[in-house]
Amino acid sequence: MECLTVGEPLICLDSMAEPFDAAAMVRKYVVGAESNVAIGLARLGHSSGYVGRVGSDSCGREIVRTLRGEGVDVTRLTATDAAPTAILLKERLGSGRVEVTYHRAASAGSTLDVSDLPDDFTGIRRLHVSGITLVLSPSARAATLEAMRRARAAGTRVSLDANFRRKLAPASVLVAEFERAAALADEVLIGRSEAALCAGSDEDGAGEAYVRSLAVDIAVLKGRGGGATAFTGAGRFDVPAQPVEVADPVGAGDAFAVGFLHILLDGGSLPDALEGGGAVAARVVARHGDYHGLPYEDEFPSTAQFQTAVQR
């Protein structure tokens, strides 16, 4: 398997064009940071798998059916009678504002534990996790960290997307758990607001200095519009933001991870990986839905179309 993800998938109820209390109809679809990445990589021709739990309910069945239909290995996505599948409400409040409300306390996904993991990660090229799972519950946190340890022991590359969710935990907890997990990662993806939170300062350069200090092979600082900066032992690489009309900003970070990991899995360069991440993010935010705009292989731009990243 090329990429295994660990997390919690949810069902989203989207009011589309208005607040929930005014919506006569809603759109329903699968969401989740890690499921978005698993789906995106599968669409681009990579073998991907998902470790997690859903409820033994209709929402859980829809999630399993959707991921399987997208080509994701769901062998380790199990159903439990002990808790329901998590639900997310997405409201459109006008002027591009989106409000998200979680119904995931004591959810099936939060019961994830170490027993759900493969014993041996040999043969898995990459593990991808996010900061969301680290704050779902103590057992989900333990499972995520143990997955990272097992992956490293097997020589599997580990990528961590910060993905801070302030509705799930206080800022101090988000930062502490991220830093604990970052010590087990090879690559870290983090947004500018998240980096500023970790740095404890909004001053220019504070977040960037924090990201540079992370002891990982590659630290990527994501900006708006798909722009990004990567820091490695070889220096700094910058790619500009791409102009795009935003229809739905939710899912942009996951989309960046898809394009970024796709290029790395194909043996591409870091500059191309940054460009690939930006290209997929720009495509996804121009459409409604978390994963619906993720490209298939024949829709992914050729690396020959990418601009040359600036190395400093």
What are these regions (language model features)?
Residues M1, A153, E203-R312:
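Conserved phosphate-binding/catalytic region of the ribokinase-like
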Residues M1-V72, R312:
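Glycine-rich phosphate/adenosyl-contacting loop at the front of the ribokinase-like
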Residues E2-L4, R125-R126, E187, I218:
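Structural motif
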Residues M16-M25, V129, G235-V244:
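Glycine/charged-rich beta-loop-alpha catalytic/anionic-binding loops adjacent to active sites
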Residues I39, I87-E91, G227-A230:
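Short beta-strand scaffold segments in enzyme catalytic cores
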Residues L41, G191, G253:
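Short, conserved phosphate/pyrophosphate- and ester-handling motifs at nucleotide-, phospho-/glycolipid
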Residues S47-G131, S302-T303, Q307-R312:
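Conserved N-terminal subdomain of the carbohydrate kinase-like
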Residues R126, I132-A209, G226-G227:
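Conserved beta-alpha-beta core of the PfkB/ribokinase-like small-molecule kinase fold
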